A protein has these predicted regions:
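Interface amphipathic segments
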Residues: 1-389
């Protein structure tokens, strides 16, 4: 027995009852609903063409308005919706369960950005706070372990707060810790009505590697996002690039600031012991500043080894057009070419020697015009197919 028009509010009252400060909607008494049905993809596909749900998907539950009771279970072998595929999904929620309120498990979750396997999430309510515990594996090889503890609550101003307790994850063979000192600073405070977000200091630590992030967003008018890196290894976060292995230790800052219509993105970074394909190039310094835009930047880059600059480049990068444009002046002094030999693959190899000179790079970023002169010293290369060296 239930009023169809009041069913959403009855369900919301049952879920909201776990919060002590929840103000329920007024609904008619003695409303309840028991349901148990099987979902057929043919029906779903008519209304949502981009959604696939396995025909063996079952949904079962119970709602009781007078008892503020809400129970729901969902089991599905496979759901594919909007580019995300979930296999062996099991979802349980019971707002009267004293051990946990929600349980979610899945064998696999595939997205365009990252794949997850063996997902297990539990949720429980305590006073006005929802606590979550989530364990899963990530990555294509399923060798990246995540152990996350986080919470959701409201502060004294009525704003939502999403925060992390001490958590850890393994990414690219590095064990990272979130909120390692348990100071309760790693959290996001937000208000969806005003579209305001405040990021308290987020801290990621892995040995000597440290990443700190703070910021705030106020609608579309103000953005302040600040990231600091301390001794972060490039190989701990960079994806694999064919024939190009980059190593080094990153330190510096990356800032994005937008206030009163003025854009001021800026980066000041240093990569110590910068290596390309296991050849040490020295220390790389990179300074980038937005020209009142987040699409056009002035750039200054150089590599220094033993107080000598082997390469320096300065100019502008413009991403405002459909095809990005570059305008750079480049200087080389005894720049070693050996590191780029793997780029030739089977066509050419044994690239060697040094290059010195000046030239410009102007035009489309993907294929710029080069103008200048280079002097090669002790240079050479090999064409394996022709047996010419």
């Amino acid at each position: 027995k239930f009023s169809f028009s009041e069913l959403p509010r009855v369900a919301q009252n049952a879920l909201g009852s776990i919060y002590t400060n929840y103000k329920p909607y007024k609904v008619e008494p003695k409303q309840y609903l028991d349901f148990n049905f099987t979902v057929y993809n043919q029906i779903i596909n008519v209304f949502f063409p981009k959604v696939f749900i396995d025909d063996k998907t079952k949904i079962k539950g119970k709602i009781n308005a007078d008892k503020d009771l809400f129970r729901l279970s969902l089991n599905s072998p496979r759901i594919d919706a909007f580019g995300t595929e979930v296999k062996a999904l099991s979802f349980r929620t019971d707002n009267k369960n004293k051990l946990y309120n929600t349980s979610l498990t899945a064998d696999e979750v595939k997205t365009a950005y990252y794949n997850i396997s063996k997902l297990n999430l539990l949720n429980r309510a305590e006073n006005d706070t929802l606590y979550f515990k989530s364990i899963f594996k990530g990555g294509n090889k399923k060798n990246e372990d995540f152990n996350l503890d986080f919470f959701y609550t409201f502060n004294s101003d009525g704003k939502s707060v999403l925060g992390f307790e001490k958590s850890s994850f393994i990414f690219k063979e590095n064990n990272w810790n979130i909120n390692p000192d348990m100071k309760n600073t790693d959290k996001i405070t937000f208000d969806l009505k005003t579209n305001e977000f405040n990021f308290s200091q987020f801290k990621l630590i892995s040995g000597e590697q440290k990443i700190k992030f703070i910021g705030n967003l106020k609608g579309t008018e103000e953005k302040v996002l600040l990231v600091d890196f301390t001794k972060v290894k490039l190989q701990s976060f960079l994806p694999k690039i064919d024939s190009l292995a980059l190593k080094g230790v990153l330190s510096g800052s990356l800032d994005f600031v937008q206030k009163e219509g003025v854009y001021a993105p800026e980066a000041s970074l240093k990569i110590a012991n910068f290596e390309v394909n296991n050849f040490n190039q020295g220390d790389l310094f990179l300074n980038i500043k937005g020209e009142n835009s987040y699409k056009k930047y002035s750039t200054d880059l150089f590599i220094e080894s033993k107080d000598v600059k082997s390469i320096a480049a300065s100019g502008t990068l413009d991403f405002s057009a459909e095809r990005p444009i570059m305008d750079l002046e480049v200087f080389l002094e005894d720049f070693k070419l050996n590191a780029f030999s793997p780029l030739g693959k089977n066509v050419l190899s044994s690239l060697r020697g040094t290059a010195s000179g000046n030239f410009t790079l102007r035009g489309f970023l993907s294929n710029p015009d080069m103008d200048g002169a280079l002097r090669l010293n002790n240079a050479g290369l090999k064409f394996p197919y022709l047996n010419i060296n």
